[in-house]
Amino acid sequence: MSFLPDFGIFTMGMWSVGLGAVGAAITGIVLANTDLFLSKPEKATLEFLEAIELKTLGSEPRTFKASELWKKNGAVIMAVRRPGUFLCREEASELSSLKPQLSKLGVPLYAVVKEKIGTEVEDFQHYFQGEIFLDEKRSFYGPRKRKMMLSGFFRIGVWQNFFRAWKNGYSGNLEGEGFTLGGVYVIGAGRQGILLEHREKEFGDKVSLPSVLEAAEKIKPQAS
């Protein structure tokens, strides 16, 4: 009778454990790249957006209802996931490229941020040609706020977005909360309603610029 361990069985066992771990990792990556487990956005209503309280970012902050932004001429509003994010800076720059067309239509371009850290908003202003307001309750990121956590870094689309923004010369930092997903709204004047609502499904999921312009062209300014 031999008391020596059977290294063949031991080796096979280690291979089984290793293959199981690799299989689990591959399964996790595959699942992370499907939309099955992405939280679905709840569509905002005009009434919900109208009641949101925003704050100006000047030396004397003023709190006001968001409906002021689109009351007369409608508005295009970007809910910024994180001002220091290079993907957000890319989208802000692209939205700002529409400023000449929006100005011809008389439609203002705005952004909201959920926090103000250091000079992050001021730095973001280099990429965004519109006024920026603070949404402390993060209401423009709702009605049901959605987050993409670390699993987002396993998504192929996210890495494609990273590479695209990097190749286009954008850079950023890691300051602030960047997991709560943002979006873009085009809202008609007065009670006209929400003409476009784009909600990020993953980091760097940008709005279609032609869709923004198409929606903005439908805005009917209110008579003064």
From Swiss-Prot:
Gene3D superfamilies: Glutaredoxin. GO terms for cellular component: cytoplasm. It is found in: Cytoplasm. The active site is at C88 (redox-active). The keyword Cytoplasm applies. The keyword Cytoplasm applies. Keywords: Antioxidant, Cytoplasm, Redox-active center, Selenocysteine. InterPro entries: PXL2A/B/C, Thioredoxin-like_sf. Residues 14-112 are annotated as: Thioredoxin fold. One of its GO terms (molecular function) is antioxidant activity. Belongs to the peroxiredoxin-like PRXL2 family. PRXL2A subfamily. The active site Cys-88 corresponds to one of the redox-active cysteines of peroxiredoxins. Involved in redox regulation of the cell. Acts as an antioxidant. Inhibits TNFSF11-induced NFKB1 and JUN activation and osteoclast differentiation. May affect bone resorption and help to maintain bone mass. This is Peroxiredoxin-like 2A. It comes from Gallus gallus (Chicken).
